[in-house]
Amino acid sequence: MSSGALFPSLVPGSRGSSSKYLVEFRAGKMSLKGSTVTPDKRKGLVYIQQTDDSLIHFCWKDRTSGSVEDDLIIFPDDCEFKRVSQCTTGRVYVLKFKAGSKRLFFWMQEPKTDKDEEYCRKLNEYLNNPPMPGALGGSGSGSHELSALGGEGGLQSLLGNMSHNQLMQLIGPTGLGGLGGLGALTGPGLASLLGSGGPTTSSSSSSSRSQSAAVTPSSTTSSTRTTSAPVAPAAAPATTPSPAVSSNDGASEATSPTQPIQLSDLQNILATMNVPATGEGGQQVDLASVLTPEIMAPILANAEVQERLTPYLPSGESLPQTADEIQNTLTSPQFQQALGMFSAALASGQLGPLMSQFGLPADAVDAANKGDIEAFAKAMQSTSSQKERESSEKKEEEEDMSLD
C-alpha cells in the first residue's frame, strides 16, 4: 500500500513528479523482530522525491523489479535518518519517527563508504527543509498551481475535495498552531493564501490574516513534537451538530455536519490556535504502541469486524478488499504514520472545534478539547454501544410487528 498525495490537483497537468530525485543511494531494507534487525538481501534504492504538489516523499524501491514498496509523505520535523552506532558489523541506518515508536531500518549497498555521511546529511536536509517549488530549476509548476488557488473560490474548491481524515492530516502532522503541515504542502504560499483568501473588505478576514501571520512554524513545531503523543485517523459517526469556532468578533456560527467545511472556518481555527505544551487533562497515549498487531489480531479475527472494516480499505486492481488486506493495512508504515499524526493532533487539545463540526457527541468534543485521548475513546465507544442498542431494539420491534 503506497501513500498518495494528500490533495487532488486543481490545475490540469500539474500533477506528477519531478524528473530527478533530490537524493538517492543504494540501500536494502531490514526487518525488525524483537531487538534484532535482519537484512533483506534484495537490491534496493532509497530516494527522496518532491512531487509537483510540493510534497516530500521518502521512498524505497526494489532495483530488480522496479517496484516501489515504501512511499511515505514526510513533513518537516517528522523524522530523522541516522546511522545506528550500535551496529559495528555493517552500515545500518534507521529512519526514526519523532512521534511514536515507528522505525524503518536500511543497510547501505553503495560500494564505497566515503559518501555515506553526505547521503545522510542531504536526506535529512531535504526532509526537514523542503525546497521551494521551482527552486531546483523546474518549470515552476508549483508556483503556477499556487496562483491558480488564489482567492476564496480556489481554496474553497480545494477544501470541498477533502475528506475529514485528509483535513485532520493537513492540520495534525507538525503541530496545529505552527502551520508546518500547511507550509510543507505548497511552501509558504498556501499558508499565506489561507490567511488572505477572503475578501479584502472583510474586517474578520483582515483580523484572521494578522493572527495567522503571527503564528510561525518555528515558534511551535519543536515543542509540539516533543510533548505530544501520536494517534490514528478515525472516521467517527456523526450525531448532533455543535457550534463552530467563534469568529474574531466573539460571535458564534452554527455549522451543520452535513455542510462542507468552509474556508472561513479553517481560517479561524488556524488563526486562533496556540498549541499548549500538553493537553489539559488525561494521560497521554501513544496509539501506535497500543494498536499493535498482537493486540489487534484477535479483534480482526472476528468476521463481523472484518465485514465492517473491509469497505474502508483502499480500492484498486492490485489492492483486493479482503480480510488479509486489513491486516496488511494496519501493519503498514503509512497507517502507523497516520496513527502518529492523529495522536499528536488529538493530544494537543486543539481538535475540539473540528470534532464539533464533524457532529461528534459532546463528551467526545470535550475530551478532544482537553487532549484526553482515553476519554475520547470511551466517549466514542459509548456512542457506538448506544447506537447498537437502539438498532437492536428497533430490529426487535420490527420483528414483533411482523408477528402481529
UniProtKB/Swiss-Prot annotation:
Its main location: cytoplasm. GO terms for molecular function: endopeptidase activator activity; proteasome binding. Residues 278-390 form the DEUBAD domain. This is Proteasomal ubiquitin receptor ADRM1-A. One of its GO terms (cellular component) is nucleus. Residues 248-258 have a biased composition (Polar residues). InterPro entries: DEUBAD_dom, Rpn13/ADRM1, Rpn13/ADRM1_Pru, Rpn13/ADRM1_Pru_sf, RPN13_DEUBAD, RPN13_DEUBAD_sf. It comes from Xenopus laevis (African clawed frog). The lineage of its organism: Eukaryota, Metazoa, Chordata, Craniata, Vertebrata. Keywords: Cytoplasm, Developmental protein, Nucleus, Proteasome. Residues 195-258, 376-404 are annotated as: Disordered. Residues 17-130 form the Pru domain.
